[in-house]
Design a protein with these regions (language model features):
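Accessory interaction regions appended to the cores of large information-processing enzymes
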Residues: 2-218
Length: 218
């Protein structure tokens, strides 16, 4: 006589998905209240310049869900440190990492301790405040602060090293990077510039350094 097959019921996970906000009802049972939006992968570049040559910020970012390719890339970068291009999180100060998690990657190969101190001091602080400004202004929904991440390619002009210690305008440098951070995040979250704008202005916008090259400056 053949034995009846035993039906195995799937075991439900005690945890709720990343994208679901859990709340307790009157009996204490957990139920999904709302599904948070996923943003996929978004990118942007921005430029903000100050009055002095070294007061220039040109971030390029990739922003997306931590449980997707952006999260994988971010974690890989943290674990794959390279001499001269150390990756660090944006922080208000030691022991106070900002949210969304923002990983800074230097575009410049760092060889100077003074450059490091400026990059991981004034510039890092400016970026950290810019990220929080973006949340405060509603550019990044507060509800997504723990579920998305930012990979932030940061530019600090090496010309800053030609300025004597004590003569660098750290307040202005902080402000430039703070403003650039808000600007680049706003562009990424808003898919700016739009494809319509790009097609309309393709022949009206000329790359600055291409123009310099045509003028014989390089």
């Amino acid at each position: 006589m053949a034995k009846a097959k035993k039906t195995v019921k799937p075991v439900k996970s005690p945890t709720t998905p990343r994208s679901v906000k859990a709340v307790k009802d009157a009996k204490g049972a957990i139920s999904p209240a709302s599904v948070l939006p996923r943003i996929g992968v978004r990118t942007a570049e921005a430029l903000v310049e100050g009055e002095l040559g070294y007061l220039c910020a040109e971030p390029e970012i990739v922003i997306g869900d931590l449980d997707g390719p952006v999260g994988t890339a971010l974690a890989t970068l943290v674990g794959n440190q390279v001499a001269g291009h150390t990756k660090v999180f944006a922080i208000l100060n030691s022991d106070a990492q900002v949210k969304p998690a923002t990983l800074m990657v230097s575009k410049v190969t760092v060889t100077s301790s003074r450059y490091t101190n400026i990059l991981m001091g004034t510039v890092q602080a400016g970026i950290a405040h810019g990220v929080l400004d973006s949340v405060r202004q509603g550019i990044i929904p507060k509800a997504l602060a723990n579920s998305i991440g930012i990979i932030y390619s940061v530019w600090l002009d090496p010309e800053v090293l030609k300025v004597s210690p004590g003569k660098v305008d750290h307040e202005a440098l902080f402000a430039v990077h703070r403003e650039a951070t808000v600007k680049v995040i706003k562009k990424a979250m808003g898919h700016e510039p739009s494809i319509d704008w790009l097609l309309e202005n393709q022949d009206k916008v000329e790359h600055y350094f291409h123009e310099c090259g045509k003028q014989g400056q390089f």
